[in-house]
C-alpha cells in the first residue's frame, strides 16, 4: 500500500514499507518474490526522497520499515515531518511495542513526529485530516487498529483507507462518507481467509459498506488493492461490487490496473512457481512499472 501523493506544492509518502507473506500453501517465498521485495524496497526508498511529509497509518512491517533496516529508515524519514498512528492509545500490545521501536528509530531522523489520530493539519495550503483509530478489518480484530488519511486542496481530494478491509468497521465507512473524496485508495477484504479465519457473514457485511462508499461518495476512481490482491479470484468473489461500480460508471481497479499493467500475483502463484509450472520475469515487470510511473514523478517534480 506504499503510496506517494503530490497535491498542491507538497508530496506525501504514505506507509513506506514492504513485506512478504511468510507462508502460503505451506511454502515460503519464492526467489521471484524475494527479487520483487528487493526491487520494491529500493523503489520505495528512491521515491521517498521526493516527499516532505511521511505518514505511517499503523505498525505492521508492510507499512513501515523493519527495525533492522537502518537504510530504509534514513531514506524514508530523515528531515521529514512524520505524521503517524499514536503508539500509546487505541492500539494492541504488538502495535505498542512496534510503535515504540518506530519512535525510537525515527525520532532522531525526522524533523518532527506528530501523533495524528483524529487530527487535522494545514500544510502548505493542503488540508490533511486523519480519522480516529478504526479497526484493521472487522470490529474487534486481533490485529488492531489503523488511521485513514484524507487530503484536500481546492477541488482535488484523496482518501487513503489503510488496512480497513472493505471498510468493514462501520466507523470507517462513516468517516469516508463524511469526507466524500473525489479519489479513493482502499484495502479490500482478505478473501483468501474466507471459511477459516474470516466468516462469510463478515465478508457480506463488509461488501455492503464498500457498496455505500462507492455509491455515496463523489469518487469516480477507486483503487481497491492490498489484502484482496492475494486472491486470484477476487473479482469473482466481489462480482456484485464490480458490477455496481460499472453501473455507476466509476472505475474500480487495482493499483497495477490503474497504471495499465496486469496484476502480478506472485504470492498466489507461489505453488506454481515453486513447481516450475509458471515462469515470471520480475525485473521486466518492475521495468514496465518504472516506465509508467517515473515520467509522472518527473512531471510532478517540474
Specify the residue positions occupied by each region the protein language model found.
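Core dinuclear metal-dependent hydrolase active-site scaffold
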Residues: 1-49, 100-171, 175, 266, ...
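Active-site neighborhood of phospho(di)ester-bond hydrolases with catalytic His/Asp-centered motifs
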Residues: 13-17, 51-62, 83-86, 159-164, ...
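Active-site metal-binding motif and surrounding structural segment of the metallo-beta-lactamase
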Residues: 28-83, 178-185, 192
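Active-site environment of divalent metal-dependent phosphoester hydrolases
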Residues: 59-65, 89-92, 165-170, 190-195, ...
Amino acid at each position: 500500500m506504499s503510496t506517494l501523493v503530490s497535491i498542491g506544492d507538497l508530496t506525501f509518502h504514505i506507509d513506506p514499507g514492504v513485506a512478504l507473506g511468510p507462508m502460503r500453501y505451506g511454502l515460503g517465498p519464492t526467489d521471484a518474490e524475494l527479487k520483487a521485495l528487493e526491487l520494491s524496497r529500493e523503489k520505495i526508498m528512491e521515491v521517498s526522497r521526493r516527499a516532505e511529509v511521511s505518514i505511517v497509518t499503523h505498525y505492521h512491517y508492510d507499512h513501515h520499515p523493519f527495525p533492522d533496516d537502518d537504510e530504509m529508515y534514513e531514506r524514508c524519514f530523515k528531515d521529514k515531518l512524520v505524521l503517524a498512528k499514536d503508539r500509546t492509545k487505541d492500539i494492541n500490545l504488538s502495535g505498542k511495542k512496534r510503535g515504540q521501536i518506530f519512535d525510537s528509530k525515527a525520532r532522531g531522523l525526522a524533523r518532527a513526529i506528530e501523533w495524528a489520530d483524529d487530527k487535522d493539519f494545514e500544510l502548505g495550503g493542503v488540508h490533511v485530516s486523519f480519522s480516529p483509530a478504526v479497526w484493521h478489518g472487522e470490529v474487534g480484530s486481533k490485529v488492531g487498529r489503523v488511521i485513514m488519511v484524507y487530503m484536500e486542496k481546492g477541488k482535488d481530494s484523496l482518501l487513503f483507507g489503510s488496512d480497513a478491509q472493505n471498510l468493514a468497521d462501520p466507523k470507517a465507512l462513516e468517516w469516508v462518507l463524511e469526507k466524500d473524496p473525489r479519489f479513493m485508495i482502499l484495502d479490500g477484504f482478505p478473501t483468501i481467509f474466507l471459511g477459516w479465519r474470516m466468516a462469510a457473514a463478515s465478508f457480506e457485511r463488509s461488501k455492503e459498506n464498500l457498496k455505500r462508499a462507492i455509491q455515496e461518495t463523489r469518487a469516480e476512481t477507486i483503487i481497491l488493492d492490498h489484502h484482496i490482491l492475494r486472491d486470484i479470484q477476487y473479482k469473482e468473489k466481489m462480482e456484485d461490487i464490480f458490477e455496481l461500480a460499472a453501473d455507476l460508471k466509476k472505475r474500480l481497479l487495482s493499483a497495477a490496473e490503474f497504471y495499465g499493467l496486469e496484476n502480478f500475483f506472485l504470492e498466489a502463484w507461489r505453488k506454481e512457481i515453486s513447481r516450475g509450472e509458471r515462469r515470471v520475469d520480475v525485473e521486466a515487470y518492475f521495468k514496465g512499472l518504472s516506465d509508467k510511473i517515473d515520467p509522472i514523478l518527473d512531471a510532478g517534480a517540474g
